[in-house]
Curated annotation (Swiss-Prot):
The name this protein goes by in its record: 3-oxoacyl-[acyl-carrier-protein] reductase FabG
SUPFAM superfamilies referenced in this protein's UniProt entry, alphabetically: NAD(P)-binding Rossmann-fold domains
Reactions catalysed: a (3R)-hydroxyacyl-[ACP] + NADP(+) = a 3-oxoacyl-[ACP] + NADPH + H(+)
Role description: Catalyzes the NADPH-dependent reduction of beta-ketoacyl-ACP substrates to beta-hydroxyacyl-ACP products, the first reductive step in the elongation cycle of fatty acid biosynthesis.
UniProt lineage: Bacteria, Pseudomonadati, Aquificota, Aquificia, Aquificales
Organism: Aquifex aeolicus (strain VF5)
Gene Ontology MF term list: 3-oxoacyl-[acyl-carrier-protein] reductase (NADPH) activity; NAD binding; NADP binding; oxidoreductase activity, acting on the CH-OH group of donors, NAD or NADP as acceptor
SMART domains according to UniProt: PKS_KR (SM00822)
One Gene Ontology biological process: fatty acid elongation
Chain sites annotated for binding substrate: S144
Length: 248
């Protein structure tokens, strides 16, 4: 069954590269208008133009820095001048500040929580108006395998990714009466520019932990997000789908 999202408007945070861009492209390929966000407005607009040309859909680029509530509010002013509302929200944007716990500063802790959790909270609140009014919406939060397993040097990041699961399950219960579905996707090791800088020795070490014996691709994550945003997933809410090659 072909998934069609014509007439829908999708906001994907942190979508100028990596998994976020793959998700935005996948939604655009199904006919959705997409809103690209990133800390560089110029880069976001360039990516939006590339996607619009490639898929023949409307695409808009907007600067949004989740460290700043002011930036988020300004971004939504711009967004609501471009579209009448959001039908699909993918909370993908996130940062890391990796350090061993005893060396982690309060700033390392606070910035990761501010972007990955508080930023998600603010973006979601700003996106709900149309979904609730029309009694249809999709929210997909991008968590991580480390939200379930933990990881050395990532106490801050792992905490936020675990927190997104509680956020997802609680919000799903609140919004279900309005037919707004809220789910999460938890990727494992995915080939991105973050993994590209790792040595072959380190990559091999990680691959040995994965039953499928390889890293995933951003598109494999995007495929799951597309499914959750479609009518094929109309009876799924409050769930987490793991895309990790069988790690657990």
């Amino acid at each position: 069954m072909e998934i069609k999202l014509q007439g829908k408007v999708s906001l994907v945070t942190g979508s100028t590269r990596g998994i976020g861009r793959a998700i935005a492209e996948k939604l655009a390929s199904a006919g959705s208008t997409v809103i690209i966000t990133g800390t560089s407005g110029e880069r976001a607009k360039a990516v939006a133009e590339e996607i619009a040309n490639k898929y023949g859909v409307k695409a808009h680029g907007v600067e949004m820095n989740l460290l700043s509530e002011e930036s988020i509010n300004k971004a939504f002013e711009e967004i609501y001048n471009l579209v009448d509302g959001i039908d699909i929200l993918v909370n993908n944007a996130g940062i890391t500040r990796d350090k061993l716990f005893l060396r982690m500063s309060l700033l390392d802790w606070e910035e990761v929580l501010k972007v990955n959790l508080t930023g998600t909270f603010l973006v979601t609140q700003n996106s709900l108006r149309k979904m609730i009014k029309q009694r249809w919406g999709r929210i997909v939060n991008i968590s991580s395998v480390v939200g379930f397993t933990g990881n050395v040097g990532q106490v801050n990041y792992s905490t936020t990714k675990a927190g997104l699961i509680g956020f997802t399950k609680s919000l799903a219960k609140e919004l279900a009466p309005r037919n707004v579905l809220v789910n999460a996707v938890a990727p494992g090791f995915i080939e991105t520019d973050m993994t590209a800088v790792l040595s072959e020795e380190i990559k091999q070490k990680y691959k040995e932990q994965i039953p499928l014996g390889r890293f995933g691709s951003p598109e494999e994550v995007a495929n799951v997000v597309l499914f959750l945003c479609s009518e094929l997933a109309s009876y799924i809410t409050g769930e987490v789908i793991h895309v990790n090659g069988g790690m657990f």
